[in-house]
Amino acid sequence: MSGSQSRTRRNPKPYAALNTLFLNEVNRKHQVKRIEDLPRQAVETDMCVDKLSPYIVKLAKNGFRFSVDSITLEFYKPKTPLKLDDAEEWAQQHLNQDLRAVATKLQPAKSLKTVFNPDDIGTDYVDLVVLGEALQDVPEKRDTVGELPTTFGPYKRYDDLSKNIKKLKPSSAAKSRERETFQKSLSTVVHDGTFAVNHGGTVALETIAQPIEIFYPPFRRISEALEDPNFQPGLDLLDVISTIVLKAGIIAQEDNYTETLRKPLMEVLEQYLGKVYTSGKHSADGLIIPLLFIDLKLAFSEGGCDPIVQAEYSVLQRWNEEELKPLREKCSCPTLILAGGGPNFVLLGAVWADRFIVQRLSDIICLAQASTSVDDHIYKAARFFSAIKLGINDLRAYYKDVRTRKMEPLQPNTPHPRFFPYPTKFKCRQSKETISFRYLNATDDDDSRNLVYLAQTQEPQPRKLIVKFSDRYGYEAHQLLADAKHAPELFYCGLLDGESDVLDSEKAKGRFRGGAGGLYTGPMRMIVMEYLEGKNALQTPREEWPPTAHAHVKATIDQLHEAGFVFGDLRLPNVIFADGDTKLIDFDWSGKEGDVFYPHGLSENAGWVEGVKSFRKIEKKHDLEMLEKHFPAS
């Protein structure tokens, strides 16, 4: 034994192993891979940390199946031993977080022998944590896309939800424990902004989704009516609201709640609004479409059951019934939900495209009379129900059209209109003609927040387009660069009707709220632009960048600055190499310096420079520093 041990010490293995965790969204399962070809002498001599970069690039390509930008790599060593079995939970907790509290950042010039003992690495612990930008397969919001996948994701999500929702009982699914389970599964999740967390406190599944109005624009009319001080309630509604206000404050046990409040409320609502749905009840006069679904309880979360959640599942189950299948396969099933707990009511809108999305259209309104001064209270309540009636009338007209609409049948591997936003035409700025188009796919199909789509015109010679949806967009900066051929040609930027361009319509414009830290207010807009055949700088290995990349990006940024604009988001995905040229895309944050602000929710590990922070003004110096950070001169 002693001889064997001696020989091992005299002739150690020529290579050292290094267990490496690449902390990035592209490593979705947070796997730890091992660098096995690192020369042992590299760890025992004065080799520097930055010499690990080629090994990381190779490991990413062969072990993780993606490429990384070596210039963006950062190396960390966990401060406390991190077992391989605990790596996934640790990664979930610290993804997109500042690691310095839990790991030591290794300076590039630091000697490896001062960091690692070759006899202690490559065991049952994570030795190295690496941050860096991936060059492909990144779940980023992009304005360029690849080919349509073999399996069409939207159909699979729709079909999985259709199969699994049959197994649910809404009253049970709305209780917290069951709800948490369902919000962790792609096949049962409702995208309403409520989410479950894993044991480590990380979000189990993203439930933020696209605005429902891009699938059904009239939803916007309801929220606009409620926000408009000039929106007047129908006079014929005052008697109805007076009756509701008298009964809304009743405190009752479940046994007599139906007789004292729920039934009278339903009677007056149906008198004014027409047939409605409640949990466990279907109206019947031929094919009844659930325009408005109502769920009323003694109180919100009474009995551990949330009436909003119960109504969500009830709407989904109703639309999943066989008799509604022909209609369901033609559209995104827009529906109104009125949920109440005691005297408190809230109005929501729901759509079922590829995902089931529910979003609020109103604040919570209390209908109980608490003051002797009641006129203003009745007026506000009347406006609330008048807005609901407005929404129901819009839905009736919509479904009348859908029922007679001719449409291709739903197929598993074919893009279908029901999965995509409603707008399919726009008035072109250049030709002044109305151009129709069809959607091909989302640029990031896995991302529930995706607002960028690849489309194709319906012309004798079809051409591809990028169709984007955003309330905030720097159309002036985009147009300036498009005119100089430094950005995609801009065909339309305006309201979802495809006719109200910001160049001609004041309603299509938005603004930043004064004194509110740059919070933006404005309508949802559709932006239609040229599709560029190319790859962005994140998808392209740095050695394949055009030699003029830095000069072109700098000249483009200088042109914006000279005109008083800032770009705001000069990261790798927003620079496109196409047709031998370098162009900028994604002008969501662009605008006049001093007028535009960084938005909510900036990721700390997205490669920002100092001074970039949510709700702070975007400055020209930020653009220039981002230029040197991400597009340095060679």
What feature does the model see in each segment?
Residues S470, Q479-H550:
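Conserved structural core of kinase catalytic domains
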Residues P546-P547, A578-S634:
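C-lobe/activation-segment region of protein kinase-like
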Residues H561-A578, L584:
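Catalytic-loop of the protein kinase fold
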Residues I378-A442:
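Juxta-kinase regulatory segment immediately upstream of eukaryotic protein kinase catalytic domains
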